[in-house]
Amino acid sequence: MRFFPFLTICALFVSCTFSPQDCKEVIRSMRGKTTVIPFDKMVCWLNDSIIHDTITQRAKYKLVVYVDSAACSTCYLNEMYQWHDFVALEEDSCFSLCFIFAPPLANRHSLQNHFFRTELNHPIYVDTSYCFLNENPHIPSSIIYHTFLLDGSNKIALVGNPLHNKKIEKLLRDHLDRER
């Protein structure tokens, strides 16, 4: 909770920096762009293991949640429980959450220790070489664009965080319902 004021200030800063028209333009430019998820260049952690293949890689639709080096990775780990309702959607194997963390090299060990202590039962991908952003230059640096849905062709179909925006949550659920 001690990071809540910081996150609130960041959200206010972002909301004051971008006009709704600017956001619409950025989202419009992202939609339909093919996004590469270089699974083979990232490490996948699950509980106390390192694994090499997950349902995430095989799912038709992937909700990518990208946490870059500018964000507080351990803060995101502490908030992972909020994704519980969306993890339940993974039972239908056409959908999966894809958490990608790109921590600064100096923080990687502490992130690993923290992750294994949280006993989360969901894989996360750790991008230590920043290959995800390198292979996807169309993804803006602002955190508000770091959660998006990829369709079956790995094209961006929806941009936004369903935890923070009920309209995005409804659009995501409607999209998945249509595809079942």
How does the language model describe each region?
Residues 1-16:
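Sec-dependent bacterial lipoprotein signal peptides
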Residues 17-56, 77:
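N-terminal "domain-start" segment that seeds a small globular fold
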Residues 48-49, 53-54, 69, 93, ...:
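Coil residues (strongly favoring Ser/Thr
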Residues 53-77, 83:
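Short active-site neighborhood of thiol/selenol oxidoreductases, capturing the structured segment around
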Residues 69-74, 104-106, 163-164:
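Short acidic, S/G/P-rich loop/turn micro-motifs used as interaction or catalytic elements
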Residues 76-117, 132-135:
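Structural microenvironment flanking redox-active thiols in thiol-disulfide oxidoreductases
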Residues 112-144:
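Short, internal strand/loop/helix patches
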Residues 144, 149-180:
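Thiol-/selenol-based redox modules, centered on thioredoxin-like
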